Amino acid sequence: MSYRNEYDLIVVGTGAAGLSCAITAKKRGLDVVVLEKEPVFGGTTALSGGVLWVPLNHHGRKQNPGDSVEAVRTFMMHETGSYFDEEAIRTFIEQGPKMVEFFERETAMKFIPTLYPDYHPDAPGGMEIGRSILAEPFDIRGLGKDMERLKPPLKTITFIGMMFNSSNADLKHFFRATKSVTSFLYVARRLLTHIKELALYRRAVQVTSGNALAARLAKSALDLGIPILTSTPASKIVMENGKAVGVVTGRDGDVQEIRARLGVALACGGFPHDVKRITQAYPHLKRGHEHLSPTPTSNTGDGTNMAEAVGGVVDIRFKEPAAWMPVTRVEFGNGEVGVFPHLLDRYKPGVIGVLKNGRRFTNESNSYHDVGAAMIEACRGMQETAMWLLCDRRTLGKYGLGYVKPSPMPIGRFIRNGYLFEGKTLADLAHATGIDPAGLESTVREYNQHAVQGKDPEFGRGSTAFNRYLADPENKPNPCVAPIGHGPYYAVKVVMGDLGTFDGIKTTVAGEVLRRDGSVIPGLFAVGNDRASIMGGNYPGAGITHGPNMTFGYVTGNYIADLSQGRKFSQW
């Protein structure tokens, strides 16, 4: 794609926030270019679940007409605690629904409602439905030749490359394929379609979740004539008279300068692979413990580093500096390693998580972020930050465990490559994993005592709508709790990972990058995970990165357009 050396706005990054900012500004009449470090576009968004938490959106209002501004504000006050930002939260509540309507009306973006509860639905202002929406599945042939530039989904959460919608409605058919004719036929159709796509295009073309979100946004940008320059990393902000006026970038091996008449918006995905910064920010890394992130390895903090280099402040202050995700390391062979995020198995009845001492430490059916935070705290003073998810053979066959798929898929290779641990008895499993055998046997005995009645008095599994949402509704009386039966027993070792950083560049509500003295750096903006999260290091619901990121991308795009037209932010 051809490009010039001067635009109104330069956006650095092709995730949901960057493309939202670019599209909004373009629709307002600005001349925009988007730069992408990788040879493919989509960023972390393309690997994600594609869910947006946008309270009071028009889809959610149909599901839950009783939701209100007051309820959302109360919920956010509770969830963010001392980090509650009145102006930012008010703007998010006001502009989020407008953002959804704008993108559905003006672009190729389409959303569908989900059944996700808030992650803490019983908290003040929490809701059991209506706040999370999902990108509608998309046929990437609509991108034309640019379909080859769409970042593929995370390999570990596909089945032979086939994607699943991150709403529970899609996945339930795959878990029920051997029990229900309807589900069997659904799965068979999906598999046949996918095999045809692989034969013709060497990848899935019917994409869902974050891949659909990234694809729809990219199509919208490309349809508007916005150049998306891949393999074009930005390395430096060009400053003149204290104002950001462009970036230095490398393209085709040449160092070049692209000028911005109005501004530069950083949307580089935060710093989950900036080793120096995360070692300072992540508590378990300070202890020298393992961390694996499924986010793109190219997210090395380019935006935060460029902002700092010109006087911007990176706000490292949240107790939880990132969105935690318990993960396992997956060996694919030939030296290829993947990261599997534990999104589903922890909720299932008959699966429990224990530390090296053999003891449970939290409600396994809480959100990934809450389980991660509990794991970091529980492993304080231990030699590693890790837990083992374990179950019996029946449960493994029914639900799978981590990257191990349910029956009838074979498990032998996972045992041979060390991903899956096996033991005929609990003591054998403890010996194989290094777990304390007495602690493990005691834990399972105590757990089973109550599990036969569907109860978990120690941690309350199944006590919230969110606990139950990804569990097994056919397991009575508690969809999250079942006893661990006879051996053999199986376990996977889970370490800490993340879905992206919460700490980030300090900005105004409109996204203007701030100096340490609180003044604005003219012409420099930050959106998405480059910008400090409004959630204060908490994770209140499904899509609390994409929802605010797209909303504030929209806000920043409008703000820059307003500046160009002599309008003030407060007027629109």
PLM regions with names:
Residues 306-313, 441, 548-569:
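Internal hydrophobic alpha-helix adjacent to the cofactor/substrate pocket in enzyme cavities
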Residues 204-211, 223, 251-330, 546, ...:
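Glycine-rich loop(s) and the adjacent beta-strand/alpha-helix scaffold that form part
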Residues 236, 243, 439-534, 538:
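A glycine-rich dinucleotide-binding beta-alpha-beta segment and adjacent secondary-structure elements
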Residues 9-34:
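N-terminal Rossmann-like FAD-binding beta1-loop-alpha1 element of flavoenzymes
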